Regions:
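Intrinsically disordered, low-complexity regions
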Residues: 3-175
């Protein structure tokens, strides 16, 4: 089977499981509660952290887009019937990642309601901070595609691009 290279940080996101976990909090001791609170203070109701990685930075960027759309619907239900190209530019790598995700989000929110099944980054220009990508997918439609969480905005909050052993990115989105 295909192993997806992004993880949903469910304990930090608003999902039925997270809400159920909140209700179970009263069973925790004070000590357990203290341990539980040792990750960045995300507001579970309004924020979600995307964490994606790959063998290359291009792949990490691709996976980050798919992680974002993974909150909006089950991307496994999407068929690659249409092709969409997305380009973006920034003034550094973080702003490039921000605008890249924002452009993909715009493809969904601006009348097209496009959801990709797969995204391929054609190139990242690290000198000019430009990116070109292509996505295969289709228009979002109920009941074919389950409705997940609405992604309202990309944020710069705690955004990271790490390129040590394996390239990985961390992005917080408003939901």
């Amino acid at each position: 089977g295909h192993v997806s290279q992004y993880q949903e940080v469910s304990e930090r996101c608003s999902s039925p499981a997270a809400m159920a976990a909140d209700e179970r909090d009263y069973n925790l001791t004070e000590e357990q509660k203290a341990v539980k609170a040792k990750y960045p203070p995300l507001n579970k109701k309004y924020e979600c952290e995307l964490h994606a990685w790959g063998d290359t930075l291009e792949e990490a960027f691709e996976q980050c887009v798919m992680a974002m759309f993974g909150y909006m619907t089950d991307t496994e239900t999407v068929e690659p019937v249409d092709t969409v190209e997305v380009e973006a530019e920034g003034h550094d790598m973080l702003s490039l990642l921000f605008h890249f995700l924002d452009e993909w989000l715009y493809k969904f929110s601006a009348n097209e309601f496009f959801i990709p099944r797969e995204v391929k980054v054609l190139y990242i220009d690290r000198m000019q901070f430009k990116i070109r990508s292509i996505g295969w997918g289709e228009e979002f439609s109920l009941p074919k595609h389950p409705q997940g969480t609405e992604v309202k905005a990309i944020t710069y909050s705690a955004m990271q691009i790490c390129e040590d052993e394996k390239p990985e990115v961390f992005v917080i989105i408003d939901i």
